[in-house]
Amino acid sequence: PAWLTQKYPERLRIKEDGRRDEHGNREQFNWANPKYRELCRGIAEKMAQRYGQNPNVIGWQIDNEYAAESYGPDVQKQFQDWLKARYGTLDNLNERWTTAYWSETYTDWSQIPIEEKYGNPGLLLSWKRFVSDTYRSYQKNQLDVIRANSDKRQFITTNMMGWFDGYDHYTVAQDLDLASWDDEVGRGHLD
């Protein structure tokens, strides 16, 4: 809602060109933003407390079509921290990514950019893995409070796009009871 955007503008995603997204667009939010996650968890918890034991509720859908990453400095820092945890040292990262080959060697974690289209294959793969882990943790943040407050017979899913390769669907689906896919017939994209 507009009040949320106005009160918490930091929860808007930063596009690849560096511009902040505007209110009113689809997927205008930053999945990695702590405030956004806190608010989503609060809504999920309240809904689960209210409807979690309702016999007419058969399941829960966390979200719809993860697809829009944020490219701001906050996400870049989270990515760099993720890389530190994964590789331990820059020497290890540089060796694993073969950065010496094209003079791409990093000497400080802050030098590592966000890149998803061109560049070092190790960087591209690591970004995709980071995005997968980010979506999974965003989802698990809500999944945990739903599970704690709902009937165990209610399934939990999220809706994914089978043709979208911006993340690893298997990683994102690990904590779900089932993975869902939508096919929007009539939109022309399958012609």
Functional labels for PLM-detected ranges:
Residues 3:
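Catalytic-site neighborhoods of secreted/periplasmic enzymes
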Residues 6-178, 182-187:
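Polysaccharide-binding and catalytic clefts of secreted carbohydrate-active enzymes
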Residues 190:
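Active-site-adjacent beta->alpha loops and helix N-cap segments on the catalytic face
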